[in-house]
Every structure is written in structure tokens, then in C-alpha cells.
């Protein structure tokens, strides 16, 4: 797929070969451009690759309900979220038409458990497996780290309003001086 995706696969394969449980959850629609041989190499190395919300004729009414959860959690203690674009045009500086810019954020502390929970919910939807216990939610991940507070809201498209829509609506409705 390109330098970014190839670099990612190299690291995932390395960790899987060192007996680290590596879970990769891909949106079945948004990840279609990934090549089958790229996926096969990951699986052959022991990476657990799972497709979320596969398109079927009987699920077409939900085709637009895609997952945009992009999360990396390392040992339940360090978390990243952001765009995680795998195409090479994300390597650019964002100042040119053919070069985009990507931003990702690193977290430690209680927010990591929230990132893990977002991933775990999608993983459970796709596989039926509940990711629980110290492997995914170590007690140390709930301790405060640093002096910056962060919160995370997980929301996935569904029928009716989502938690994110309600959060923003209530936040806007609660404004008293500025918005």
C-alpha cells in the first residue's frame, strides 16, 4: 500500500513474532484499498486482523454507519488516537495540494482506559470477544499521570442520536456567556 502502511506492518509483525497479542480492527468499507497480500502477511505473522461491519445485502441500510475509531493502545498504559492515515500522501507537510498532514495524540493515565474501552466495544461487536482483565485494563492505567486532564467520548454512528450529538447539543444549550 505504501511506505506508511509497510512501516506499520513491519512493527506489527515484529511484535506478533515476539508473542505480543496484536489486534488490528479494520472498518470493512474504509479499509477496502488495503491489498489482500498486505493483510495476509499480517495474519501469517500472528496479527489478529478482524473486519468491522462487513457489507452484506441485508445490512445495506446501515452501510453509512462506519467506524472511525482510530486507536493504538500499548500494554493498556499508553494510548494514541488521531487520523492514522496509511496512504503516503499523509507524509506531506499539508502545504501542498498533494501532501496532507496528519495529527495524532498520545495519552497516559485514565484516558488510556477510555481509549481501550472504545476499541474493546468495537472488537466485541466484530468478534463477540470481550477484552477484559489486566492485559487490557491494568490497574496502573487508572492512575493520574502528569498535570493535564483529558476526557474521551466514544461514539459510533447508529440509528437515532449518538452520545456525541447529545453531548454537543447539551454543551451548546448550556452556554451562558460565549460559544
Residue ranges and their predicted role:
Residues 1-178:
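Charged, low-complexity intrinsically disordered terminal segments
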Amino acid at each position: 500500500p505504501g511506505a506508511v502502511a509497510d512501516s506499520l506492518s513491519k512493527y506489527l509483525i515484529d511484535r506478533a513474532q515476539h508473542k505480543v497479542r496484536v489486534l488490528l480492527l479494520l472498518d470493512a468499507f474504509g479499509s477496502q484499498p488495503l491489498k489482500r497480500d498486505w493483510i495476509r502477511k499480517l495474519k501469517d505473522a500472528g496479527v489478529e486482523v478482524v473486519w468491522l461491519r462487513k457489507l452484506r445485502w441485508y445490512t445495506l441500510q446501515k452501510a453509512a454507519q462506519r467506524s472511525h475509531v482510530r486507536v493504538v493502545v500499548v500494554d493498556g498504559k499508553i494510548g494514541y488516537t488521531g487520523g492514522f492515515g496509511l496512504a503516503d500522501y499523509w507524509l506531506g507537510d499539508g502545504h501542498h495540494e498533494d501532501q496532507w498532514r496528519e495529527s495524532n495524540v498520545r495519552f497516559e493515565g485514565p484516558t488510556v482506559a477510555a481509549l481501550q474501552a472504545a476499541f474493546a466495544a468495537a472488537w466485541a461487536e466484530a468478534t463477540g470477544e470481550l477484552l477484559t482483565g489486566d492485559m487490557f485494563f491494568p490497574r496502573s492505567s487508572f492512575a493520574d499521570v502528569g498535570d493535564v486532564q483529558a476526557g474521551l467520548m466514544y461514539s459510533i454512528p447508529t440509528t437515532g442520536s449518538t452520545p456525541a450529538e447529545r453531548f454537543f447539543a447539551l454543551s451548546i444549550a448550556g452556554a451562558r456567556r460565549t460559544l
